[in-house]
Amino acid sequence: AHYVNNGNGRTEVATAVEFDSNGSALNTLTAWKALADAGVAPNVGRGGDAGLADFSAGKSAMTLGSTASLKQILTDVNGAFEVGTAYFPSVTEGDKGGVSIGGASLWALESGDEAKKAATWEFVKFLVSAESQAYWNAQTGYFPITTKAHDEKVFKDNIAQFPQFQTAIDQLHDSAPEYAGALLSVFPEARQIVETE
């Protein structure tokens, strides 16, 4: 289900949310409450650090999180138990589910200085290179932004040693386009409202 109208803001500018009327918010919150009521999804606080720490210490059987946490989890667990990964679950039975990418944005601001502009562009090219992206993925779990990174030795070696990294990549490629996420210019304000009201 879409988060906002107009094809999740991809066919035209989003003008209204849909999650409050299409059942997706209610389904998600109902499922989440059922897990909490059953005692299998405790409230470990705001943010993800406490949940990740509990999982890494063997205090919980599973955790939901960003792929960006995977390397840290594997490091923290340090072989004390097997860390498995799976596709992100769907809420509604029969729903294929999917994932979207986000975070780790790279921005370059116009300063009017041509030398800085040229240096910034060289730095951006370095960061988005297949070699840098393969290393970044292996060290963090973040998705490489280019599939050319998959051809790099560091990427292949990491997948061979930690096949858990492949799960998120596979699910991203298996996700339908509507899971790419909503384009909504007021997302920062909307998040703040959800968090505070």
Where are each of the predicted segments found?
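Glycine-centered hinge/linker elements that transmit conformational signals in sensory
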Residues: 6-45
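Periplasmic solute-binding protein
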Residues: 1-13, 29, 100-110, 190-197
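Pocket-flanking alpha-helical
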Residues: 52-54, 70-76
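Stable alpha-helical elements in mature extracytoplasmic
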Residues: 25-32, 51, 69, 116-120, ...
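Paired acidic/hydrophobic, glycine-rich loop segments that form the ligand-binding mouth/hinge
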Residues: 61-66, 84
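Extracytoplasmic/periplasmic substrate-recognition and gating elements
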Residues: 34-41, 75-143
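Short helix-initiation/N-cap motifs at beta->coil->alpha
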Residues: 43-57
